Structures are given as C-alpha cells and as structure tokens.
From Swiss-Prot:
Its cofactor is Mg(2+). This is Phospho-N-acetylmuramoyl-pentapeptide-transferase. Belongs to the glycosyltransferase 4 family. MraY subfamily. The chain crosses the membrane at residues 24-44, 66-86, 88-108, 129-149, 160-180, 192-212, 229-249, 256-276, 281-301, 330-350. It comes from Helicobacter acinonychis (strain Sheeba). Its main location: membrane. GO terms for cellular component: plasma membrane.
C-alpha cells in the first residue's frame, strides 16, 4: 500500500530500493509488536488464555498462568508491515502472506482447543495434520503453477543434483512444510528457545532470497536466480523485526508464549523461504536446532515402542538437559549458540560453491 502510493503515484525513489523497504518493514513490525503485545497480554490474562503446563515438567509449573497465543500479535504485525512496504502485485509476497496467515490459523485452532480443554492435547492429531497437509499442498501446487523450477540443489555445489518431476517436487515441498512447521512447534518449549533460532534461520534465508532475486548477485555467486522472489525479503525482515519485539516479552521469565499460533506460522514461513530459494537441503543445517529437537522425539518414541527403553530422560531434548540439572537459561543460550554457528556455516555456501 505505502509502497504503491509513495513510489507508484508520488515517485519517491527511496521506495524503489528493496533494502530500504525491508528495513522500514523491520522497524514497523518491531514497534507495532512492542506496542500491541502488552495490550494482548492484559486481554489474554483477563480471558484466562493461559498455556496448560505438562505435569511431567514440575519445574515449569510456575509458568501455568502465563498467557499464550502471542504468535497472533507478531504475525499480525508482520502482515501490516508487509502490506505497507512490499509490492502486493508480487505472487511470492501474496503466497508468503497466505502461508503466515494459514499456518497461524491452524495453530490458533490448536491453542484455542488447549485453552478450552485445559489440556496439552489440543486438536486431534488427525485434524491438525490434515489441516497442515491441505494448506501445504495448496501452497506447493500454487508454487508449481507460478512456474518455480523443480531443480534440487545441495549446499556448496553450483549445479543442481537433478530436476524433480512436478509431482515429486510438490510432494517434496509438502514434506518440507510439514517437517519445518512441526519442528519449530516441538522446539517451542522454553522461553526464547524457538524465537531466536527462528531469527537466525530467517536472517540466513532472507539473504539467500535477496541474492536469488538479484540478477547481478546471483550471477556473481553462481546462485540460481528466481525471478521476482527478492520481494519476499521485505516480509522476512518484517517477521524478524516482529520476533525481536516478541522476544522483548518472551525472554526468561516469559510474560507471554507464542503458542502454536506463532510456532506453526514460523515453521511454515521458514519452509516457504527455503523452497523458493532452493535451500530445502541446506535448511537441515540452518535449522539445526529444530532438526535436533525433532530427531530426539522420533528416536525417543521409536526406542520406547521397539525396546521399551527411553534414550533420553525426556523429549524433546531440551527437557532432557533440564532433567540432568541444567538451568533453563543455560539450555536456551547454548542452543542459541549452536543455531548461530550453524547459520554462519550455511552462509559460507553462498561463496564456497
């Protein structure tokens, strides 16, 4: 809106620069989240929209009155900033907004059910998976219709591994959406544990998206060019800004939790960025913390079902370290460090190809 008005009608040249609009979107989303979150916290406390705490984590029982669904606020702030600063005629922007709103809605349904039932169960697994699957499939098909190429790239290699048939590509993209959204959801168990690794991952992906959308940079770095995808940089920076605003209230001890409303939206948008920038495989490194958390759950369940033994004291793995006596802050900061280092290595693949 603001972009179309100031550049399209008044020809204010500053708004033609993607980096300026992305920076502006960052600060709009950041300050809007800072402004709205206290009001949301007061409303959520009045409505008793609190996060049910598992009885298996006694050290977290002091958090039982902490409101949840804070993800609604930072997703809303991101959408507002994107509407103001991004080009709404760009299909990647529109699909990015659909991803954020759609995945956040599924998360909201799950959060609402948990609050109403005062249980961690939420929606049935079939219902939740079904909604996420349909949403992922719709977005993946739309990407295919848009003409996104189906080459599969590996980190540090300039040439693609192979070209996937359309049906295989769509199925693979659906898998990426489902994996990333659930992985971030599993990670969101300690104050700030999901938000900061999400910031690192989104920042890395936004750089890849910017390069992919810039003809000169993509040619120089031997990176696959994706026409029009650079505009997604604006939404990514806006989401990072809103996450910083959220972290202001989510740092330990948290005043609010993001809930599934936020974690599913983050995972879905991270997956979307990875897909359109051809970083599906590299996402394993960028989202290393999310991968580790998910694998710990898979291994724990698999071990118990096959051997009746647990590999970890508790899963996801951040609870394992808590059970071993690590302070919550120690677990959080160490996981942040791993995430930061993983993303620095991932960024090296831009130049080392």
């Amino acid at each position: 809106m603001l972009y179309s008005l100031l550049y399209g009608y008044f020809n204010i040249n500053l708004f033609q620069y993607l980096t300026f609009r992305a920076g502006l979107g960052f600060f709009i989303a950041f300050f809007l989240t800072l402004f709205l979150m206290p009001k949301f916290i007061l409303w959520a406390k009045a409505k008793k929209a609190n996060q049910p705490i598992s009885s298996f984590v006694p050290s977290h029982q002091n958090k039982k009155d902490t409101p949840t669904m804070g993800g609604i606020v930072f997703v809303f702030a991101t959408i507002i900033a994107s509407l103001l600063c991004a080009s709404l005629g760009n299909p990647y922007v529109l699909l990015g907004i659909i991803v954020l709103v759609g995945f956040s809605f599924v998360g909201f349904r799950d959060d609402y059910t948990k609050i109403n039932q005062q249980s961690n169960a939420g929606m049935s697994a079939k219902m939740k998976f079904g909604m996420l699957f349909v949403l992922s499939l719709v977005v993946s098909v739309l990407l295919s219709v848009k003409g996104l190429d189906t080459f599969l790239y590996a980190p540090f290699l300039k040439n693609p591994l192979f070209e996937m048939p359309t049906a295989l590509a769509v199925g693979f993209w659906v898998l990426v959406f489902l994996s990333a959204s659930n992985a971030v959801n599993l990670t969101d168990g300690l104050d700030g544990l999901a938000s900061v690794p999400s910031i690192f991952t989104l920042l890395s992906l936004s750089i890849f998206v910017y390069v992919a959308g810039n003809a000169e940079f993509s040619k120089y770095l031997l990176y696959p060019k994706v026409i029009d995808v650079g505009e997604l940089f604006v939404i990514s920076l806006a989401l990072i800004g809103s996450l910083f605003g959220f972290l202001w209230y989510n740092c330990n001890p948290a005043s609010v939790f993001m809930g599934d409303s936020g974690s599913l939206a983050l995972g879905g948008f991270i997956a979307y960025n990875a897909i359109v920038s051809h970083n599906e495989i590299l996402l394993v490194l960028m989202g290393s913390i999310f991968v580790i958390e998910t694998l710990s759950v898979i291994l724990q369940v698999g071990s118990y079902k096959t051997r009746k033994k647990r590999l970890f004291l508790m899963a996801p793995i951040h609870h394992h370290f808590e059970q071993k006596g690590w302070a919550e802050n120690k677990v959080i900061v160490r996981f942040w460090i791993i995430s930061m280092l993983s993303n620095l290595v991932a960024l090296l693949s831009l130049k080392v190809r």
